[in-house]
Curated annotation (Swiss-Prot):
UniProt name for this protein: Ion-translocating oxidoreductase complex subunit A
Record's subcellular location: Cell inner membrane
Listed GO biological process terms: electron transport chain
Enzyme class, broadest EC rank: translocase
Function description: Part of a membrane-bound complex that couples electron transfer with translocation of ions across the membrane.
Amino acid sequence: MTHYILLIIGTALINNFVLVKFLGLCPFMGVSKKIETAVGMGLATMFVLTVASLCAYLVDHYILIPLNATFLRTLVFILVIAVVVQFTEMAINKTSPTLYRLLGIFLPLITTNCAVLGVALLNVNLAHNLTESVVYGFGASLGFSLVLVLFAALRERLVAADIPATFRGSSIALITAGLMSLAFMGFTGLVK
């Protein structure tokens, strides 16, 4: 049990996919203008990443490896992720149409979120078993959601701040993301 808790902490804080591995920057920058949309996107990504990790493991170990078709991993994982995203999109549309409208184009873009594909491929490269794959996917999504919500809160505060004209918009957002990355470096060495 300790191994799984350390895997979650390590994936969410120390090896954060956005701030350390620079995966998932498109939704990180695009959806982080309001906390409400950031929370919704974080929850949707959390569900997709966890389920996609499970499905990718099952497809890899029960279809690709027995058929000796591991060269198709990337393509098959993208298809698996697309199916999971479509399922998530339909579920959000039925349960919360307001959130569905707020997320707009970013919900289908989870399919092309490189963090989701990166987690699936890293699970294979790190030789995780089924439980470790799901926990790794959950930890990565937890870290993504945490950083997304924190960044959205900072960006909401930046709207009211007196920022020079040349730094408004993407410039100050990237500077803020860099400072967040430096802050998360403080977690290095937390888990050995």
